[in-house]
């Protein structure tokens, strides 16, 4: 089989963010046109605009953040193509928490450890996947299975109903992983209220509809940065946006 080498420079245009001109971090794609950007760059841009930065198509007149989604496949591709990028990003996150005097969340610790193991394996020439290399001891596997993200950074939430068409939750105060998404909350509320579909719900923060792929950590940082816990979210029946 014939193979040829391709320079990273030749594909840079496909794996960089048009807004910051850096390699994609937390890749996020516009569902309407499929153009991809760094999540932080795109969200900041959409706070004052409602069009795609690349093709200028209108994403949505009033709620463009509802029509973007995390692109895990693209992010995996970028990390595999750019040597050291994922390791550098994990190091930045670790330094960020240390600078604030905060403990690094368990999920980030796990990702940092995975990256280190991957880098060390390549340095040692272990390019082939070994069945025994990535197997975890039974005790560690069992402990991980029963952790349920309790070692993650946690977020305290108050879920309030702001519609007469839905009833309030009996227990509106919850605490969960910062990596949980708005979609997880929708499913939780739908289950508690016996709704036929979680898609019938909108969840809002500061009267702004949140995208289903937004993590709670992202919501806290961008919508609740200077406010005290708990994070106050409201839910209501889904409204069709024109």
From Swiss-Prot:
Keywords, sorted A to Z: Metal-binding, Nucleus, Repressor, Transcription, Transcription regulation, Zinc, Zinc-finger
The signal peptide annotation in the UniProt record is none
Location (main, coarse): nucleus
A Gene Ontology cellular-component term: PcG protein complex
| First and last residues of each zinc finger (RING-type) | 17-56
> Which InterPro entries has this protein been placed in?
PcG_RING_finger, RAWUL, Znf_RING, Znf_RING/FYVE/PHD, Znf_RING_CS
- Give one Pfam hit by family name: zf-C3HC4_2
Q: Name one GO molecular function term.
A: zinc ion binding
Q: Where is this region: Disordered?
A: 120-149
What compartments host this protein? Nucleus
What is the documented function of this protein?
Component of a Polycomb group (PcG) multiprotein PRC1-like complex, a complex class required to maintain the transcriptionally repressive state of many genes, including Hox genes, throughout development. PcG PRC1 complex acts via chromatin remodeling and modification of histones; it mediates monoubiquitination of histone H2A 'Lys-119', rendering chromatin heritably changed in its expressibility. Within the PRC1-like complex, regulates RNF2 ubiquitin ligase activity.
> Quaternary structure per UniProt?
Component of a PRC1-like complex.
Give the protein's recorded name. Polycomb group RING finger protein 3
Organism of derivation: Xenopus tropicalis
Gene name tied to this protein: pcgf3
């Amino acid at each position: 089989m014939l193979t040829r080498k391709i320079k990273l420079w030749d594909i840079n245009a496909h794996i960089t963010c048009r807004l910051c001109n850096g390699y994609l971090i937390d890749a996020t794609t516009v569902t309407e046109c499929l153009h991809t950007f760094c999540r932080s760059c795109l969200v900041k841009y959409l706070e004052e605009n409602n069009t795609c930065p690349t093709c200028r198509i209108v994403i949505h007149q009033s709620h463009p953040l509802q029509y973007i989604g995390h692109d895990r496949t693209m992010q995996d591709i970028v990390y595999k193509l750019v040597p050291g990028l994922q390791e550098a990003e994990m190091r930045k996150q670790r330094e960020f928490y240390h600078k604030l005097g905060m403990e690094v969340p368990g999920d980030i610790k796990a990702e940092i450890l995975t990256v280190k193991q991957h880098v060390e394996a390549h340095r040692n020439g272990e390019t082939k996947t070994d069945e025994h290399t990535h197997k975890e001891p039974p005790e560690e596997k069992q402990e991980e299975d029963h952790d349920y993200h309790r070692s993650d950074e946690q977020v305290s939430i108050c879920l309030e109903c702001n519609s007469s068409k839905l009833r309030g939750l009996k227990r509106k105060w919850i605490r969960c992983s910062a990596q949980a998404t708005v979609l997880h909350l929708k499913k939780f509320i739908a289950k508690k209220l016996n709704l036929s579909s979680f898609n019938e719900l909108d969840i809002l923060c500061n009267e702004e509809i949140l995208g289903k792929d937004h993590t709670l950590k992202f919501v806290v940082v961008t919508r609740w940065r200077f406010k005290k816990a708990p994070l106050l979210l409201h839910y209501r029946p889904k409204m069709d946006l024109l």
